[in-house]
């Protein structure tokens, strides 16, 4: 059975970058891929310095935002990574198969490690945990952006290595499902949209707050005057139109920009109207969840139960193939208790 898994870090409430780059696609995929699993990956959020209270609030904000954006607990499992301890168990197993050099060559590791004096081991092992996140559920498809392809290749390589070492075709080699929306640039037009850079628009922001951020946003740098013809293909605002506006509106914006019929402010005002139309229902659902927080807790609890069921079965089978079958002690009789399968593998006495 085909299975989809994807995760997102708990950065708090969603912004339009991760909404367009991932979550909007998840909402569509849950309709075509029953049983999809979507995870708030909080273990990935602790590779650097963090405040526990802030992390707790961000996990909640992300879960609420995902539900408000359209993730349906009746169609997909939404859960928090740390609620399923098997993630870290499988991650440790995979570290025994992963060459150090493969991790040091990861682009994101080289970029992030160059910005810190002391490099935490967790930063290096980040893609190993990511491989475990995916393979724990034996997912064969992973919706990702282009910046995650290298990490997914490591997961595919890990699956091949484990299968070869233990003589089993157990783990699938997950394939990428590239997000239809191209990489979303920040409002400054210089880098990827990111909360840490302050170049985002939050999904829960009001109509006025959206306009306040769109007004100074970067457009075509060569269009200095309103009478100058524009180049929509290099304008970040036009890319947002393609994500939020109707096709006929996008075509109108393209023509008005190229002919200098509209100025950039005209274009931005139309974009704001398109964004408000799509985001207002999401804000409304988020407000309803704020009023009934138990709905968020129930969704996460149900998702975690589903995820744990799959994860436990995977780890039971993985341990068996690896010779790590569980051994327990029956305290009442003080005798060794184990499965018949384990006993049958014990070496006979000389």
Q: What feature does the model see in each segment?
A:
Residues 2-132, 283, 287:
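N-terminal Rossmann-like or analogous alpha/beta NTP/dinucleotide-binding catalytic cores
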Residues 63, 70, 98-101, 139, ...:
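A generic secondary-structure signal for well-formed alpha-helical elements
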């Amino acid at each position: 059975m085909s299975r989809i898994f994807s995760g997102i870090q708990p950065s708090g409430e969603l912004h339009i970058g991760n909404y367009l780059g991932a979550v909007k696609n998840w909402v569509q995929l849950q309709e075509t891929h029953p049983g999809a699993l979507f995870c708030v990956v909080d273990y990935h959020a602790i590779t650097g310095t963090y405040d526990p209270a802030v992390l707790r609030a961000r996990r909640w904000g992300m879960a609420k935002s995902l539900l408000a954006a359209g993730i349906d607990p009746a169609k997909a499992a939404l859960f928090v990574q740390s609620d399923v301890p098997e993630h870290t168990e499988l991650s440790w197993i995979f570290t025994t198969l992963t060459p150090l050099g493969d991790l040091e060559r990861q682009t994101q590791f080289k970029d992030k490690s160059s910005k810190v004096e002391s490099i935490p081991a967790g930063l290096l092992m980040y893609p190993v945990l990511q491989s475990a996140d995916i393979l724990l559920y034996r997912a064969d498809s992973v919706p990702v952006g282009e910046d995650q392809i290298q990490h997914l290749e490591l997961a595919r390589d890990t699956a091949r290595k484990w299968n070869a070492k233990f003589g089993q075709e157990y783990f699938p080699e997950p394939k990428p499902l590239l997000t239809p929306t191209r990489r979303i640039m920040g409002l400054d037009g210089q880098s990827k949209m990111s909360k840490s850079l302050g170049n985002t628009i939050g999904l829960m922001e009001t109509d006025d707050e959206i306009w306040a951020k769109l007004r100074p946003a970067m457009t075509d740098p060569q269009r200095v005057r309103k009478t100058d013809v524009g180049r929509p293909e290099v304008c970040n605002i036009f890319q947002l139109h393609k994500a939020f506006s109707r096709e006929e509106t996008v075509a109108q914006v393209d023509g008005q920009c190229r002919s200098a019929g509209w100025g950039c402010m005209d274009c931005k005002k139309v974009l704001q109207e398109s964004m408000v139309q799509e985001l207002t229902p999401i804000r409304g659902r988020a407000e309803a969840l704020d009023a009934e927080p138990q709905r968020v807790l129930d969704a996460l609890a149900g998702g975690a139960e589903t995820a744990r069921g799959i994860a436990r079965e995977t780890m039971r089978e993985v341990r068996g193939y690896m010779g790590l079958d569980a051994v327990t002690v029956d305290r009442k009789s003080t005798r060794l208790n184990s499965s018949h399968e384990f006993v049958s593998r014990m070496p006979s006495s000389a």
